[in-house]
Regions:
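Short helix-loop capping/hinge segments that flank enzyme active sites or metal/cofactor-binding pockets
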Residues: 75-95, 256, 313-374, 395, ...
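Flexible N-terminal pre-Rossmann segment of NAD(P)-dependent oxidoreductases
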Residues: 7-11, 65-78, 252-253
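Gly/Ser-rich, acidic/histidine-flanked active-site/gating loops
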Residues: 77, 89-92, 225, 242-316, ...
Length: 484
């Protein structure tokens, strides 16, 4: 079979693997097509490293396998990108910050190793918000630069996993890995029109297979996790199955689903975004999904008591431990902070360094976080809910220039609010509770900017959440390729 370039670019991860396993598509041809795509779209700054030689060599090894050997590899010949804060053997891991530029780990992070063992090919490292400490991916580090949204290169892709999301949306790769602390897989997935999973944190088996704190440049051991991102829910489920060791997944039965709509996360939205989100709700309801309004009136207040204290307390010790364990070029947090290039990240680290024990961390971890987790558990149980559903962000992607020298944005002309409040408000509570979250496309604002919906599930219910996502995707559809 002969594949055109356009046909190759439109392959989902699942479709690409099936074609390569069947011998219908050579891995070398596919990788060459995607490498050319990456080079042609270098203006997006989606990647910090493009491994041309390594990717082609890996593709040649896949093509040299017999048909039976390829069939045994669940990701045979699948090109992926890995966020630049996740350790990759032989490829720079800099967290897109100057002090770590040139650092090359000697071992893959466990999640990366599982993908490679399954036949995946590392195309390169994905750009990101510097040190993962932000939600725009507007990076001023000279070796990185600001990531641009493929739907409109003058707008942010979201962050901090903006490079992974931009690369997937731009058809540079069909799938990849990001990380998520407060929303960093889900926010860029929403703004770029793709799918992103934040796995459960605290669910020992799943978390250990996804996340090794010594193999990912950290922010918070309580909240950090690696997460898969892809063009479709099936693609994300495929990567999740490889990493966790689970088997194939079928869509949930739509007519049996009870989905909660948490009132606090449906308030204060951009009007155009809310219209798209509510149109999606109507489609789900028409398909037989039962939608249940839930109050959760304490949600945001409880989250505030947890989030600030953790954000001030954990980064210093966690980053210091990673620097020492990895024999990094900079051996102190102060040494890393002194060379931070992005003003917003420098300000954040100045605050952390000035008051590393700020906030009531003990109270947050022993009282308020358990109460937040209890609120979620009671909400799921009391209403018999399978998941919660809400817009991933309060507004669509804003122009990059709007954030230059400012960290405040306006929603429909209202008084400006902090960018973190605008983009993190809806994703952060699940992060602090440790429950899984799945962002998937709901549609487009003005036919040009993606809107995402997020499904949050009970702790440890990742595979059930993905099954619901498969069912919802069949109703809502996926987004077309952006016109770049």
């Amino acid at each position: 079979m002969t594949w055109t370039v356009d046909q190759q670019l439109e392959l989902s991860a699942t479709q690409a693997v099936e074609a390569i396993q069947a011998g219908q598509l050579k891995a070398t041809d596919y990788v060459a097509t995607l490498l050319a795509r990456a080079q042609a779209l270098s203006n997006l700054n989606a990647l910090t490293v493009l491994d041309v030689e390594g990717a082609l060599a890996a593709a040649q090894r896949i093509d040299a396998l017999g048909a039976n050997e390829r069939a045994r590899l669940p990701l045979a010949g699948l090109p992926v990108v890995v966020k630049d804060n996740i350790n990759t053997r032989g490829l720079q891991t800099s967290a897109a910050t100057p002090a770590l530029e040139g650092f090359v780990p000697t071992r893959h992070a466990p999640s990366v190793q599982r993908l490679v063992d399954a036949g995946a090919i590392l195309l390169g490292k994905a750009n990101m918000h510097e040190l993962a400490f932000g939600i725009t991916s507007t990076n001023l580090a000279p070796h990185a630069g600001p990531v641009r949204n493929p739907w409109d290169p003058e707008r942010i892709p979201g962050g901090s996993s903006g490079g992974t999301a931009a690369a997937i949306a731009a058809r540079i790769v069909p799938a990849g890995l990001g990380t998520d602390t407060g929303g960093s897989t889900r926010i860029p997935a929403a703004l770029c029109g793709i799918v992103g999973l934040r796995p459960s944190v605290g669910d020992g088996g799943t978390q250990r297979r996804y996340h090794d704190p010594q193999a990912v440049v950290p922010i918070s051991h309580t909240r950090d996790t690696v997460g898969p991102m892809g063009r479709t829910v099936a693609d994300v489920a495929l990567l999740d199955a490889v990493i966790t060791g689970h088997g194939p997944l079928s869509p949930a039965a739509v007519t049996n689903l009870r989905i909660g709509l948490p009132a606090p996360l449906w308030e204060g939205l951009e009007a155009a975004l809310e219209d798209v989100a509510r149109t999606a709700l109507a489609k789900l309801e028409a398909a037989g999904v039962t939608l249940v309004p839930v109050e959760m009136s304490e949600l945001l207040a409880l989250n505030d008591r947890v989030s600030y204290a953790i954000a001030l307390h954990e980064p210093i010790e966690d980053l210091a431990a990673w620097l020492v364990a990895n024999h990094a070029p900079a051996q102190t947090v102060a040494g890393v902070a002194a060379r931070i290039a992005s003003p917003d990240v420098r300000a954040a680290y100045d605050a952390v360094l000035a008051d590393a024990r700020g906030g009531d961390y003990h109270g947050a971890m022993t009282m308020w976080r358990p109460r937040l987790q209890q609120l979620y558990a009671q909400t799921f149980a009391a209403s018999g809910l399978d998941a919660l559903l809400f817009p991933t962000t309060r507004l669509a992607a804003v122009p990059i220039d709007e954030l230059n020298g400012s960290s405040r944005v306006s929603i429909d002309g209202a008084a400006p609010i902090d960018e973190m409040e605008a983009y993190l408000r809806n994703t952060d509570p699940a992060s602090n509770a440790g429950i899984p979250g799945l962002a998937l496309p709901a549609g487009l604002v003005d036919a040009c900017l993606p809107v995402g919906l997020e499904l949050d599930g009970p702790a440890g219910g990742d595979r059930r959440l993905l099954a619901i996502g498969l069912a919802f995707e069949a109703i809502l559809g996926t987004l077309p390729a952006p016109e770049i």
